[in-house]
From Swiss-Prot:
It catalyses: tRNA(Pro) + L-proline + ATP = L-prolyl-tRNA(Pro) + AMP + diphosphate. This is Proline--tRNA ligase. The keyword Protein biosynthesis applies. PROSITE patterns: AA_TRNA_LIGASE_II. It comes from Ectopseudomonas mendocina (strain ymp). Gene3D superfamilies: Anticodon-binding domain, Bira Bifunctional Protein, Domain 2, YbaK/aminoacyl-tRNA synthetase-associated domain. Its EC number is 6.1.1.15. Belongs to the class-II aminoacyl-tRNA synthetase family. ProS type 1 subfamily.
Length: 571
C-alpha cells in the first residue's frame, strides 16, 4: 500500500477530550474518529488492526469446534421479558419501538436470542454438544462513555454460546474455550492473565476473566508469585497471614475518644498500630427490615461482592444510613464495634485472629481498647469479607499474592440452566425424557483488545505494535523518491516484499513532507520495521533498517534485506 493511495490521517496534537493513552494514540495515528459520545468510526489504519484480531479469534474459535453464526443486533422485547432481564438490565439496555409500537432493544449481549434459536433448532441429545459464535457490533448505553474504545457505547464483540446435556459436557467445552482464549491472546503477543472471577449480572456457576496487564487497567487482579493461581480482586480468597490468635496481654478498657470518627484519627490520636483496629460497617440484612454489621481490620477494605454473596446479607449490597444505624444501635458511624452490639455481626477471618484490638464502644465518642475474643465477647460468625492485599498467602498454598492492574478483554461463564430454564429450552434425552440444556457463554471484546494492546505497548513516540497486530509489517521510506535511482530501487524492493507476503506501507509522499515527519508518522503509527532507501545508502549498496522497539538504525546490504527481514518478522 502506498500512502498516496491510502487515508493517512495522523495528528500532531492530542485531542483535548482524550484521557487514556490508547484513545490519544488511536486518534493521533488515524485509526479512529469520534462520531458522538462513545461512538467511533474505524479508519483504514485502525480497521487493518481490528481485522487481524478478528481473524485470530475466528481461527481459534473454529479450531475449538465452534460454529459461526450471525444474529440480529435488534432483539424483540418478548425474549428479554421471558428471561427476566428486560427489567433487570437497567438503563444500559437501549430500548426502541418500531412503527407498530412493538418494543425492541439494541443487543448488548445475545443469550436470549441464541437460546431461542437453540430451542427451535435442537430437539435431541444427539445434536449436543453444540457451540455457536458470532463477531458482531453490540451496544450498551453507558451513562458516561469514556476512555475511547475502552468504555464506549458501541463495540465489537465475539460472543459464543454452548449447549449441553449435562454439566460434565459443559466443563469439557469450557476447558476447551479457556485454552482457545489463551491461544488467542498468546498469538496476539499480549501479556495477559486468566483469572477466577465473579459471575456478576450474567449469572451462572463459574467464570474466568482474561486480563491484559497494564498500569491503566480498571481492575485489580491478584496472582501467586509461584503458581498459576490468579483471580479478580472481587473473587480472590483472602487468607490470613496469621496462623493463630496471639494471647491477650491487655485488659479491656473504655477510653474517651472525642472527635475520633475515622481509623486514621484513632491511629494518629492514640498511637495505635492500624493492624490493631477494626472497621464496623452496617448493611441491610437479607431479613427484611433488619441490619447486620460486617467487621474488617482497620487496614483492610470490605469486598462488596463477597459481602453481597453472604446468605445473611441483602443483595445487592445496601449500606445502612446514619439514621438507620442510630435507631438500631444508639450510636453513629465511627463509634461502632462488636462489644454489646445489639444487631448480628459477621467478622472477617483476619479480625477473628486479632488480639488486644481497639473497637468502637457503640457509645458516642468512646472506644474499647485491649479487646480480646472469647474473654471479652464471644467470637461471632466468621467469613471472608475483605479484598486481598499484596503479600497475602496465595489461596492455593503456593507463594504469596502480587497485585497488578488489568484490562478485561475476555470473560467465560458456566451459565448452567439460568436461561434455558427461563425460556424452556429442552431436548429429548437419551432416556426419551425432556432434558433442560446446560449452557456456557464466552465473550471477547474484539475492539477493546486493540485499545488494551496499545495501553500495554507504547512509548513517548507512539504505538509499539508487534508483528501479529501491526497494520503493516514494514514501513518503506524513500528519501528523495522523485529521483530515478531511489524510485527504481524502492519500487523493486516494494514489489519483492509484497510478493514475499509482507504488508508494506510505502511512504511516497512528495518532498514537501520532510524525512523527519515521515519517520515520526511511522513511529506514531507503530509499524514495527522501517526500511529507508536513500541516494547515499544505495551508493554504498546499503539500506537503513530500524526496529520500532529500538533506538538505533543499522545498515543492511541491499542484497541481504529479504533474509534479514525474514529473520526478524514473525507471521
Amino acid at each position: 500500500m502506498r500512502t498516496s493511495q491510502f487515508l493517512l490521517s495522523t495528528l500532531k496534537e492530542t485531542p483535548s477530550d482524550a484521557v487514556v493513552i490508547s484513545h490519544q494514540l488511536m486518534l493521533r495515528a488515524g485509526m479512529i474518529r469520534k462520531l458522538a459520545s462513545g461512538l467511533y468510526t474505524w479508519l483504514p489504519m485502525g480497521l487493518r488492526v481490528l481485522r487481524k484480531v478478528e481473524n485470530v479469534v475466528r481461527e481459534e474459535m473454529n479450531a475449538a469446534g465452534a460454529l459461526e453464526v450471525l444474529m440480529p443486533a435488534i432483539q424483540p422485547a418478548e425474549l428479554w421479558q421471558e428471561s427476566g432481564r428486560w427489567v433487570q438490565y437497567g438503563p444500559e439496555l437501549l430500548r426502541v419501538k418500531d412503527r407498530h409500537e412493538r418494543e425492541f432493544c439494541v443487543g448488548p449481549t445475545h443469550e436470549e436470542v441464541i437460546t431461542d434459536l437453540a430451542r427451535n433448532e435442537l430437539n435431541s441429545y444427539k445434536q449436543l454438544p453444540i457451540n455457536m459464535y458470532q463477531i458482531q457490533t453490540k451496544f450498551r448505553d453507558e451513562i458516561r462513555p469514556r476512555f475511547g474504545l475502552m468504555r464506549g457505547r458501541e463495540f465489537i464483540m465475539k460472543d459464543a454460546y454452548s449447549f449441553h446435556a449435562d454439566q460434565a459436557s459443559l466443563q469439557e467445552t469450557y476447558d476447551r474455550m479457556h485454552q482457545a482464549y489463551c491461544n488467542v491472546f498468546s498469538r496476539l503477543g499480549l501479556n495477559f492473565r486468566p483469572v477466577q472471577a465473579d459471575t456478576g449480572s450474567i449469572g451462572g456457576t463459574g467464570s474466568h476473566e482474561f486480563h491484559v496487564l497494564a498500569e491503566s487497567g480498571e481492575d485489580d487482579i491478584a496472582f501467586s508469585n509461584v503458581s498459576d493461581y490468579a483471580a479478580n480482586i472481587e473473587k480472590a480468597e483472602a487468607v490470613p497471614r496469621e496462623k493463630e490468635r496471639a494471647a491477650a496481654t491487655e485488659d479491656m478498657r473504655l477510653v474517651d475518644t472525642p472527635n475520633t470518627k475515622t481509623i486514621d484519627a484513632l491511629v494518629q490520636g492514640f498511637g495505635l498500630a492500624i493492624e490493631k483496629t477494626i472497621k464496623t460497617l452496617v448493611v441491610h440484612a437479607a431479613e427484611e427490615g433488619k441490619l447486620i454489621a460486617l467487621i474488617v481490620r482497620g487496614d483492610h477494605e470490605l469486598n462488596e461482592i463477597k459481602a453481597a454473596n453472604l446468605e445473611q446479607v441483602a443483595s445487592p449490597l445496601q449500606m445502612a444510613s446514619e439514621a438507620e444505624i442510630r435507631a438500631a444501635i444508639g450510636a453513629g458511624p465511627g463509634s461502632l464495634g462488636p462489644v454489646n452490639l445489639p444487631i448480628p455481626c459477621i467478622v472477617d477471618r483476619s479480625v477473628a485472629l486479632m488480639s488486644d484490638f481497639a473497637s468502637g464502644a457503640n457509645i458516642e465518642d468512646k472506644h474499647y481498647f485491649g479487646v480480646n475474643w472469647e474473654r471479652d465477647l464471644p467470637l461471632p460468625t466468621v467469613a471472608d469479607l475483605r479484598n486481598v492485599v499484596a503479600g497475602d498467602p496465595s489461596p492455593d498454598g503456593q507463594g504469596t499474592l502480587e497485585i497488578k492492574r488489568g484490562i478485561e478483554v475476555g470473560h467465560i461463564f458456566q451459565l448452567g440452566t439460568k436461561y434455558s430454564e427461563a425460556m424452556n429450552c429442552q431436548v429429548l434425552g437419551e432416556n426419551g425424557k425432556p432434558v433442560t440444556l446446560t449452557m456456557g457463554c464466552y465473550g471477547i471484546g474484539v475492539s477493546r483488545v486493540v485499545a488494551a494492546a496499545i495501553e500495554q505497548n507504547h512509548d513517548e513516540r507512539g504505538i509499539l505494535w508487534n508483528d501479529a497486530l501491526a497494520p503493516f509489517h514494514i514501513a518503506l521510506v524513500p528519501l528523495r523518491y522523485e529521483t530515478e535511482q531511489v524510485r527504481e530501487a524502492t519500487d523493486k524492493l516494494y514489489a519483492e516484499l509484497t510478493a514475499a507476503g509482507y504488508e508494506v506501507l510505502l511512504d511516497d509522499r512528495d518532498k514537501k513532507t520532510s524525512p523527519g515527519i515521515k519517520f515520526a508518522d511511522m513511529e506514531l503509527i507503530g509499524i514495527p520495521h522501517r526500511v529507508v532507501v536513500s541516494d547515499r545508502g544505495l551508493a554504498e549498496g546499503n539500506l537503513e533498517y530500524k526496529s520500532r522497539a529500538e533506538t538505533e538504525a543499522q545498515a543492511v546490504p541491499l542484497a541481504e534485506i529479504l533474509p534479514f527481514l525474514q529473520a526478524r518478522i514473525s507471521r
